[in-house]
Amino acid sequence: MIKDKDIIVIGIQAWDIEIGSNCKNIAAEFAKYNRVIYVNNPLSFLDFFKTKKSERIEKRKRIVFGKENGLRKVSNNLWEFNPKTVFAPTNRIKQNYLFDRLTRYNAKKLSNEILRALNLLEFKDYILFNDSSMFLGNQIKT
C-alpha cells in the first residue's frame, strides 16, 4: 500500500461527470493515505466553441478566463484541478508528424499547468498515475 506520498492522477474521465468512474474511485482510495490531485482534461478548441452550453463547460470557460479558480479541494487529501489551458484538437489528424507535434505541444502546456498547481499545493516527491490517457499521458513530463 502506498502511504504518505503526493500523487497526480490523470485520465480521460473528468471529476465532475455525473456518472462514477474507476479512475475517480482509485483517486479517492489513494487519498485515504496520500495527498492526491486529480487533473481533468483541458477543454479543446472544439469543446470551447462548439459544445452546447452546460454548467460543466461554462465553469471550465470561467477558469480559462481567470474568473474562477481551477483548483478545488474535494476532501481532506484530494483536490480537483481544471487547467486553464485550451488544447489544439488532435483526434481527427491523420498525419503522424502533425499529430505528434500537436500532442507534444498540448502535453507541454498541460505539464506547465500541473506544475503550477503542484507548487501551490507544495507537492514535492510525487507519483504520476496515468489512467487511460494513452497519447497525452505518454508525453507528460512534470
Set out the residue ranges of the language-model regions.
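Conserved nucleotide-sugar donor-binding subdomain of glycosyltransferases
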Residues: 82-136
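Active-site proximal beta-strand in glycosyltransferases
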Residues: 7, 35, 127-130, 141-142
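Short loop/helix-cap segments at secondary-structure boundaries that form the rim of catalytic
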Residues: 73-74, 137-142
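Short amphipathic alpha-helical segments and helix-helix/interface helices
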Residues: 24-28, 115-118, 140-141
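N-terminal subdomain of nucleotide-sugar transferases
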Residues: 1-64
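Flexible, charged surface loops at secondary-structure boundaries
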Residues: 1-4, 31-32, 72-75, 119-124
